[in-house]
Amino acid sequence: MANKTILFNKHLESNAKMVDFHGWDMPLNYGSQIEEHNAVRQDAGMFDVSHMTVVDVIGNDACAFLRKLLANDVAKLKVPGKALYGGMLDENAGVIDDLITYYLTDTNYRVVVNSATREKDLAWIAKQSQGFDVTVTERPELAMIAVQGPNAKAKAAAVLSAEQNTAIEGMKPFFGKQAGSLFIATTGYTGEAGYEIIVPEDEAQAMWQALLDQGVKPCGLGARDTLRLEAGMNLYGLDMDETINPLAANMGWTIAWEPSDRDFIGRKALETLRDAGTDKLVGLVMEEKGVLRHDMPVFFTDSAGVEHQGVITSGTFSPTLGYSIAMARVPNSIGDTAEVEMRKKRVAVRVVAPNFVRNGKQAF
């Protein structure tokens, strides 16, 4: 039996096409993936992300524990509510998961991890927490709704109370705040402004309906994938996993090398990889007809005339740009052109930074 979120019946009411997503019954689309994608780029859309795992890390050693657990450094977080993105690595510097950590107080942090990795993550976190004065608590009674797009904040404001709107007024990107029963964060997975709202399960259906009534379009996993890919955001399991280190997954910016005496898990292996040089994750753009797809081989010739090969990790047709885009893992000697093998022939592609669309506009 697949797991169902508290919003399952709301999806059926909107004629969602449901699919199995890592053991969860989730909406793929509600009729038109393209319309859902465009709603987020041009107006406002919402996603049921209640399958995500919310974990509270509380105790005197919460900061010290997370400084060991994560490659990014939570000690950088000084303002209550500030969030941090980064990887949780194994001893070989493979990425166990990518996650967001919110600093609430010196002894209270909230971590949001992926659903596909839930059991593995919880077991790893529990194992690593031994010896630290911390309590790690999963919060399955909380649902989550992401409201994204240029008009998302205004439409969400219409369903929030006056007190909640006052509490989050002027909140900068990548912050989260408890406002009444809701935890409202200025985070997302689309490259647009908006909120991710953690809501008690018994309030989630009413909130979903209230957002629907404000004209927020329900969006499924299909649009979520094209939006995050346009924004150059990794999908765990495709763009990185335990066989891939963060330097080869465009996550170098999330590694806090300083202070040099912070011994986070995987640090020694990662330093060795850094010094030796690793592959890198780049963006590909193909303006010819056709669609770049996961696992297609990528070829390029370096300045010395030597041919190298890489692979597409994520690819799709970009509704915003009108042509195909992809992320690919390649040797770091790549220039600004390459070829992708599709249908037994090689097609020219441009190599760009893996960030294609931000706030509705081309970003490269």
From Swiss-Prot:
UniProt superkingdom: Bacteria
SUPFAM superfamilies for the chain: Aminomethyltransferase beta-barrel domain, Folate-binding domain
EC class of the enzyme, as a word: transferase
EC number: 2.1.2.10
Subunit record text: The glycine cleavage system is composed of four proteins: P, T, L and H.
Main function: The glycine cleavage system catalyzes the degradation of glycine.
Protein name per the record: Aminomethyltransferase
Organism: Shewanella baltica (strain OS223)
Gene: gcvT
